[in-house]
Regions:
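GST-like domain detector, emphasizing the conserved glutathione-binding G-site
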Residues: 2-156
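Helix-boundary capping/turn motifs
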Residues: 68-69, 186, 244
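Short alpha-helix boundary/capping motifs
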Residues: 74-76, 222-223, 241-243
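GST-like fold's C-terminal all-alpha helical module
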Residues: 125-239
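C-terminal active-site "lid" helix and adjoining low-complexity regulatory extension at the edge
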Residues: 237-250
Length: 250
């Protein structure tokens, strides 16, 4: 295999210059994903809330064979029915909304929405990792679930469950060091911050905007895992979460 040129540009988010219609499955908008990926769940929640019929391609987490065609190897990757290729979950949310009714502002138009969409990646995503992978026991529980749901072969499932639990425990520990409070207390405080930004029923007021889908996807990936009780017991976030789940059926 030829080595990548040092001058070759790095892959980037947003709409890509080259269309790949052959990667649109059955002529439908197509998402390349892991079933349990929080960033993929952002996109799925928007697609399903809008009633958009789409194809879902489960990516092998080890080999990533299904994404060999793309320089961007992180999920989700989105390919529209016409072959338009979009990278990065928040950019995908903006693209889908813009091409399907334009119900929330574009990036750079609403600073509050931008702030809370960034929060989903920079703060909330890291906060839940610190809780889910708090110790080896909780890490093993999470990896048992992930390796059963995602597209792992039997051998890879066994290896990734046990070895992955050790690795993710280390990741969880490193994420915890990013915050001043212990993981559960930190997540509670982050949810408190979110609750102050939810106006009426949603971040977007009477209807959800990009911040709703971005943060819902992150928390949805936590459902059934260690620490989700923090979400369930929050006076503001749990009703909001329930509204988003009812709306998206994800």
């Amino acid at each position: 295999m030829a080595r990548k040129s040092k001058t070759e540009p790095e892959p980037y988010g947003g709409v890509q210059p080259k269309k790949v219609p052959e990667k649109s499955i059955d002529g439908k908008p197509t998402i390349y994903t892991y079933a349990t990926c929080p960033f993929s769940l952002k996109v799925k929640s928007l697609l399903k809330s809008r009633g958009i019929d789409f194809s879902n391609v489960e990516v092998d987490p080890m080999k990533k064979t299904e994404l060999k065609w793309s320089d961007w190897t992180k999920v989700p990757v989105f390919v529209d029915a016409d072959g338009t290729h979009v990278n990065d979950s928040n950019d995908i949310l903006h693209y889908i909304d813009e091409t399907n009714g334009g119900k929330f502002p574009r990036k750079g138009v609403d600073s509050k929405q931008d702030e809370w969409m960034d929060f989903s990646n920079d703060i909330l995503g890291k906060s839940i990792v610190a809780v889910i992978y708090k110790n080896y026991r909780t890490s093993l529980h999470a990896l048992d679930y992930v390796t059963r749901v995602d597209k792992f072969g039997l051998k890879d499932r066994i290896v990734n469950k046990w070895l992955g639990a050790i690795i993710m425990r280390m990741v969880g520990k490193s994420r915890a060091k990013m915050f001043d409070e212990p993981p559960r207390e930190n997540l509670t405080n982050q949810l408190n911050s979110m609750s102050g930004a939810i106006e009426k029923d949603f971040f977007g007021g009477e209807s959800p905007n990009g911040a709703d889908f971005a943060n819902y996807g992150i928390l949805r990936s936590m459902q059934g895992l260690n620490g989700f009780d923090i979400v369930e017991n929050h006076d503001v976030i749990w009703p909001w979460y329930s509204r988003m789940q009812l709306l998206s059926d994800v």
